Design a protein with these regions (language model features):
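Membrane-water interface at transmembrane helix exits
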Residues: 95, 99-100, 229, 251, ...
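Generic structural signal of hydrophobic/aromatic residues within well-ordered alpha-helices
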Residues: 26, 30-37, 52, 174, ...
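Membrane-embedded catalytic scaffold of the fatty acid hydroxylase/desaturase
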Residues: 85-204, 272-304
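Generic amphipathic alpha-helical segments used as scaffolds and interaction surfaces in large
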Residues: 13, 17-24, 118, 122, ...
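Active/binding-pocket-proximal capping segment
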Residues: 243-249, 255-278
Length: 304
């Protein structure tokens, strides 16, 4: 009979618990900052996101144009780099932030957080569920926030150790290279299907929009553009493949830096009992890590 193992949760010695009064005051301060930011939104912000959108469109067009001359190695390298840059920008600085509703106030359909569809095999609806709701509501709560290792990686000592994790340095490499595919199937909860906690019929129903999006993305990058490239079909195909790989490596790296560094904390489900807004704010801080770099770095990382 397996005895339950008591988990000791790491508490960063740099942090201290706040009193209820301090938490209430803390929440009011952050709410005030939020309101000040909302009140300050205006034309400069609209111009910024439109410039980002234009940069993505132009870099994608130029990258694909260069790949049409991809038999010439410098053209292939430049085209692949531009296309990879475009995909990174679209996912990180445009798609991620737009889907958080940051630009809903513009009332521009292109930047509507509920309808925006991004350039990756995963559906935006699934991302809004797994990331916007589940991850940001239950940040770093063990057993709820799937971002803690995505069910594949052991990132904290609070996670139960299994012998298979010895292979983690090996299988994390293909996971990194194929990261968009992991994001695409995250909300399908395949593990629950295998353990009979979700019916096959429910799984197949949820799989339909995923398959549709995957088919659309594969057709665009690996059928349509290679076909219209004619003699340059092969360099266009490989350029798209490498550009997607570059995007996967970058997004994997940035996302794993955000919540899984040595000072970040993991929390038990019990913290949700009577959790106030101040507690929630504090959990976001204690479970997250800062990223610092150049302005270009912050743009490419979506200002996380």
């Amino acid at each position: 009979m397996n005895m339950p193992v008591k988990v000791e949760y790491f508490k960063n010695p740099k942090n201290r618990d706040l009193t209820p009064a301090e938490l209430e005051a803390f929440a009011k301060e952050l709410d005030q900052i939020k309101q000040e930011v909302l009140d300050d939104l205006g034309e400069k912000d609209a111009k910024y996101i439109r410039r980002v959108y234009a940069a993505i469109r132009y870099s994608s067009f130029l990258g694909r144009a260069c790949l049409f001359a991809g038999w010439f190695p410098p053209a292939w390298i430049l085209g692949t780099g531009l296309l990879g840059f475009s995909k990174i920008m679209e996912n990180m600085e445009l798609g991620h932030n737009v889907m958080h509703g940051q630009y809903d106030w513009m009332n521009d359909p292109k930047f509507n957080g509920q309808t925006y569809e991004w350039d990756t095999v995963g559906t935006s609806d699934n991302w809004r569920q797994t990331h916007n709701y589940k991850h940001h509501t239950y940040t770093n709560i063990k057993g709820i926030d799937d971002d803690i290792g995505y069910g594949l990686l052991r990132l904290f000592p609070e996670q139960r150790w299994k012998p298979g994790f010895l292979l983690q340095p090996i299988y994390s490499i293909p996971f990194c290279l194929l990261f968009q595919w992991g994001v695409a199937i995250q909300n399908l909860e395949i593990g629950r299907v295998l353990y009979k906690r979700k019916t096959k019929a429910q799984f197949l129903e949820e799989l339909k929009p995923v398959n549709k999006k995957i088919g659309k993305q594969l057709f665009k990058d690996y059928v349509f553009f290679p076909l219209i490239a004619g003699p340059a079909a092969l360099p266009v195909f490989t350029g798209n493949l490498v550009a997607n790989g570059l995007r996967n490596i970058w997004t994997f790296s940035i996302i794993f830096c955000g919540h899984f560094t040595k000072d970040a904390e993991v929390f038990p489900k019990s913290v949700l009992q009577e959790e106030s807004r101040g507690h929630w704010y504090m959990r976001q801080i204690r479970g997250s890590s800062n990223l610092t770099g150049s302005e270009a770095f912050h743009i490419l990382s979506g200002h996380l």
